[in-house]
Swiss-Prot record:
The keyword Ribonucleoprotein does not apply. GO terms for cellular component: virus tail. InterPro entries: Pectin_lyas_fold. This is Depolymerase 2, capsule K5-specific. In the N-terminal section; belongs to the Przondovirus depolymerase 2 family. Its main location: virion.
């Protein structure tokens, strides 16, 4: 090894530098530059694209992992591989695998390379409790976890990173083999049996058989890994897997025509993948072949920068590895947490950017998905979010079957998604946003400063999700009759402020399409253009009901009643301006009663606080003896006899009316009723 050639006897001045250091000391101070530099050629690798270089490459990489060293491939070499190049790295080692300018060609269905970190510290069985403790020099105590290891633990100082795991299933698991496990940072070491951490993971696993270990301080760098294969039926092996490593770094990896996942991060902490590039990853789930370009599995805080991927199942995805409840394979425990994917591009994928149910806190920033399609077992979403507390920031989807899909159906607990600056554009048959929650859970989506444009009948579909939106612009260019900016399904809640709904083709459109009963809609300060293509503000069917409030500024009038359809329990308060005229069309009705029969009148779905009816009585005995139920307790109904009435108007006790006595109104007189939850009562005459 290079640096060993410069070892000097103690006290020797041979090879002493100007600053007094020996060459040996200079190498040591340079860290990784002072490790062994190994060449596959020195181990017998030909790199000629003909010979099988598996054995020499494997030995070269294993030596580097065992000793701590740097492997440098030959520029222009083509290494044929017929088996896995596997290495294990212990604590404190630095390993760099630099294959820049060379290429790997797999000839069998085997992983190309796997590097696994090996913890030299022992596994400790622990118990935990929530305490208040001072973890620094401040005067304020911190709520923390006191971790007690009766048999001793291996932590020595604040800031060390550990992993805890338990035989209980991880939160929001989607497989019965996904067991709990989360990393933590040591805040204080009190003794050889007690330490503290501010991580709250332990609250989830109290009372279980909890174990901890110190994560190995191994450094692994992989540079320029370039793998090219051919699609082969039955092949499914992964290409590169890094497991149980602290801050591994993968620099400019590249693949083409491979048969399974490319880069797998399994149980790593703070991994970085920089500028990965991939084309044509085969996706055949029936054969166990999954075209995952970057698979972030049970890792913590990964940074994936500059993905450029074409034709894969996922350009990025999370997953949880399979393990046994009582084994100590800590790197296979837990779910993916707090990873960030930045400046990514996925084109022609099945779902470009994806998270599975157990993931938490995954953030996509400035990522673009173009032309995602429905593939095998996938839904064609540019962004498919199935975890909790994920976020999309300044992301774009173009011509994807679904721009962004939030699916909480398989999540066992509550979940949230945050969307800011999202842009979508797609043709007919493609949906901008699909938000699907699970009945009985709280699933929330917060959207801000976003815009989508579609030729599809509906721009956004919501089911069992609470949506809060601000400054969202929905452009519906659909020529299909009765399209809508928002389609509200079962168990959905929509609250918007600001933004716009724009229509430019077709007819009979509406801002809201109510597709189920029980939904709640609160739309405020909405700009609406293309009102000439509209029929209603709210459209629904006669069997559906819900609570709806719409406040909008239209660029022109819409015909007739702003509510189309609706059951008797539908409650709608609509306020809008059109042509500089302010209107509350459901709050006022001009009616005529021209018969002496008992007349039951409907509120016309109005959910306004105050409703006014002006009734013209034209025959003797004209009367009202029934009114549909009020929308809420305290709702007020003013009934006036029009000055144009030629006869008295009689308000009788009857269906939902309990005034104590009938009220007779002369022309120009009125009565005020209020809803007490059971009947309309007289407030004044």
């Amino acid at each position: 090894m290079i640096k060993n050639d410069f070892n000097q006897p103690k006290g020797s001045t041979i090879g002493v530098l100007k600053d007094g250091r020996t060459i040996q000391e200079a190498f040591d101070s340079l860290g990784y530059l002072g490790v062994a530099v190994l060449s596959p050629a020195n181990y017998g690798a030909k790199g000629d694209g003909k010979a099988d270089d598996t054995i020499p490459l494997r030995q070269c990489v294993q030596d580097a992992c065992a000793l701590g060293g740097r492997v440098v491939g030959t520029v222009g070499a083509e290494y044929k591989i017929s088996g896995t190049i596997a290495g294990t790295v212990g604590d404190g080692k630095y390993v760099e695998l630099d294959f820049t300018g060379s290429k790997f060609v797999p000839t069998t269905d085997d992983a190309v390379m796997t590097i696994t970190g090996v913890a030299t510290s022992p596994v400790a069985e622990v118990t935990v409790e929530v305490v208040s403790v001072n973890l620094g020099n401040g005067s304020t105590n911190t709520i923390a976890m006191k971790v007690t290891a009766p048999g001793g633990h291996s932590f020595t100082k604040k800031g060390e990173i550990g992993k805890a795991w338990s035989p209980v299933l991880c939160l929001n698991n989607d497989l019965s083999t996904q067991y709990a496990g989360e990393p933590f940072v040591v805040g204080l070491v009190e003794s050889s049996t007690v330490f503290y951490t501010t991580s709250v993971f332990t609250e989830l696993y109290m009372g279980t058989s909890l174990k901890v270990i110190r994560v190995p301080t191994t450094q692994v760098v992989v540079k320029g890994l370039d793998v090219e294969s051919e699609w082969t039926t039955g092949w499914k092996a992964s290409t590169l897997t890094l497991s149980g490593l602290l801050r591994p770094f993968v620099y400019k990896p590249k693949c083409k025509n491979i048969n399974g996942p490319f880069v797998n991060l399994t149980g790593c902490y703070g991994a970085t993948v920089f500028l990965p590039e991939g084309d044509n990853l085969r996706n055949a789930p029936s054969e166990g072949a999954y075209g995952y370009f970057v698979n972030d599995s049970a890792s913590f805080g990964s940074t994936i920068y500059g993905i450029n991927c074409t034709n894969a199942r996922h350009a990025y995805t999370t997953s949880s590895p399979r393990s046994e409840p009582t084994d100590d394979k800590w790197w296979l425990k837990g779910r993916t947490l707090f990873s960030e994917i930045t400046n990514g591009l996925g084109t022609g994928c099945h779902n470009a950017f994806d998270t599975h149910s157990p993931s938490y806190g995954i953030k996509f920033t400035n990522c673009r998905a173009v032309g995602d399609f429905r593939g095998v077992d996938t839904g064609g979403a540019g962004f498919q979010i199935r975890g909790d507390r994920s976020s999309l920031v300044d992301c774009t989807a173009i011509n994807s079957k679904i721009g962004a899909a939030f699916t909480a159906v398989n999540i066992s607990g509550n979940s949230e998604l945050y969307i800011s600056g999202f842009t979508y554009e797609g043709p007919a048959g493609h949906l901008a946003l699909s938000l699907s929650g699970k009945a009985g859970q709280v699933n929330r989506v917060t959207i801000s400063d976003s815009r989508w444009k579609t030729l599809e009948q509906y721009a956004t579909a919501i089911t069992n999700v609470e949506v809060s939106a601000s400054n969202v612009e929905a452009v519906v260019d659909s020529a299909t009759t009765a399209s809508a900016a928002w389609r509200i399904g079962e168990g959905a809640t929509l609250r918007t402020r600001g933004g716009a709904a724009r229509f430019s083709a077709g007819s009979g459109h509406s801002v809201i399409s109510l597709a189920a009963s029980g939904a709640k809609v609160d739309v405020g300060d909405l700009e609406v253009t293309g009102s000439s293509f509209m029929q209603y503000l709210l459209a629904t069917l006669s069997q559906y009901a819900g609570d709806v409030y719409i406040e909008a500024d239209l660029d022109g009038a819409i015909p007739g009643n702003p509510v189309g359809g609706g059951g008797t329990d539908l409650k709608a308060a609509v306020v809008y301006t059109a042509g500089n005229k302010f209107r509350r069309p459901l709050a006022y009705r001009a009616l005529t009663i021209g018969n002496a029969n008992g007349n039951t009148l409907g509120l016309n779905y109005s959910g306004h606080d105050v409703i006014t009816w002006e009734i013209t009585a034209t025959v003797a005995g004209a009367n009202v003896n029934g009114i549909t139920p009020g929308a809420f307790i305290g709702q007020q109904l003013n009934i006036g006899s029009s000055p144009a009435s030629t006869q008295q108007l009689i308000i009788n006790n009857g269906t939902n009316i309990a005034m104590g006595h009938a009220v007779t109104l002369e022309a120009g007189r009125g009565v005020t009723l209020y809803w007490n939850g059971a009947n309309w009562r007289s407030g004044s005459v």
